[in-house]
């Protein structure tokens, strides 16, 4: 089955079960995805590429992770001006909602509170890639 778009949805979450579930969901909706277990791995694997080499994309980013947090990665991306080219959708637990709202005010595309609706998340991804 061919992907519906040539864009890539990057998933950065330190929980292997979440990464696996999101990869399955995206595959079932014919969306290309790449999963990373840490912000550091994502930064080394994707953000080191020149922007002209990268595919159109969006980023599903866990707010809290071991090592570099999703918030720290977002702040680094803001400093480098990478948010406009790669919309960020934060995945957050209930306690992080005020922080997630603040990130949207600062340039994140949106946030989804865990547990999230598959359809709502896919709709947000489609909007981010439009």
Regions found by a protein language model. Name each.
Residues 19, 66, 75, 92, ...:
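The feature encodes the CheY-like receiver
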Residues 96-98, 112-126:
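C-terminal output helix
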Residues 37-38, 69-75:
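Acidic catalytic/metal-coordinating carboxylates
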Residues 54-57, 81-87:
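His-Asp phosphorelay/catalytic-motif detector in bacterial-type signaling
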Residues 2, 16-36:
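Two-component/phosphorelay signaling modules centered on CheY-like receiver
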Residues 35-58:
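Acidic, metal-coordinating helix/loop segments flanking the phosphotransfer/catalytic sites
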């Amino acid at each position: 089955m061919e992907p519906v778009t040539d864009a890539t949805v990057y998933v950065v979450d330190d929980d292997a079960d979440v990464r696996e579930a999101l990869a399955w969901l995206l595959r079932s909706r014919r969306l290309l995805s790449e999963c990373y277990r840490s912000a550091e791995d994502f930064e080394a694997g994707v953000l080191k590429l020149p922007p002209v080499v990268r595919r159109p994309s969006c980023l599903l980013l866990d707010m809290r992770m071991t090592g570099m947090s999703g918030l720290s990665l977002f702040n680094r991306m803001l400093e480098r001006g990478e948010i406009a080219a790669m919309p960020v959708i934060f995945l957050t637990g209930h306690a992080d909602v005020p922080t997630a709202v603040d990130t949207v005010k600062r340039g994140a595309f949106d946030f989804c509170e865990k547990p999230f609706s598959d359809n709502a998340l896919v709709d947000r991804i489609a909007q981010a890639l439009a």
